A protein has these predicted regions:
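N-terminal capping segment at the start of a domain
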Residues: 2-36, 85
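A non-catalytic alpha/beta surface segment that caps or lines the substrate-entry region
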Residues: 29-72
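Buried hydrophobic packing segments
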Residues: 42, 102-110, 137-138
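Phosphate-handling active-site elements
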Residues: 54, 73-76, 106-125
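Histidine/acidic-residue-rich, glycine-tolerant segments that coordinate divalent metal ions
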Residues: 62-63, 67-68, 85-93, 97-98, ...
Length: 163
């Protein structure tokens, strides 16, 4: 089976977890710096699938970090960023409940691929980046050099276009 098919099949197997996160966050929107239940929801799913989660990452009460893929002698490091805060009065109109869920879906899929024997040449972490709608916490994380040891970072974000 090709890696593309393996990835696709595993994504489908983790889809119920991603949908559950999305629905829970959408029904219970938490504003910037107050995403305590959101972090618990995401962390619980990551832990359920064998990932160790560091809460209050970089001294931010609602940030987290978990290793999806860990290898000996990595040739690079990737950060998958995960947003989950909501907007006042309109909740997840910006789509962080869905985009954060998709970041978790990617991390779970890659984690399982490694468990199933797929060889990776890089470390891959998922990093929860809270407080995006108010102060843009990723800027604070950059200033704290959280990303200095990563070769690149990716994230999912929704837009208003239909596909």
């Amino acid at each position: 089976m090709s890696l593309t098919n393996t990835f696709s099949d595993l994504c489908k197997s983790f889809a119920p977890d991603a949908f559950a996160i999305n629905y829970t966050l959408a029904k219970n929107p938490e504003l910037s710096s107050h995403e305590f239940e959101s972090v618990k929801t995401i962390g619980t799913v990551l832990e359920k699938h064998g990932m160790d989660v560091t809460y209050e990452f970089c001294n931010l009460p609602t940030a987290f970090k978990a290793s999806a893929v860990k290898v000996d002698n990595p040739k690079g490091r990737l950060a998958i960023l995960c947003e989950y805060d909501a907007l006042p009065e309109v909740g997840h109109a910006c789509g962080h409940s869905a985009s954060g869920s998709m970041s978790v879906l990617a991390a779970l899929t890659l984690h399982k691929m490694q468990q199933d024997g797929v060889a990776f040449n890089m470390d891959i972490d998922i990093i929860g980046t809270p407080d995006e709608e108010a102060t843009g916490c990723k800027v604070d994380m950059c200033n704290a050099e959280v990303f200095k040891d990563y070769d690149f970072a990716i994230m999912v974000h929704l837009d208003g276009e239909e596909t």
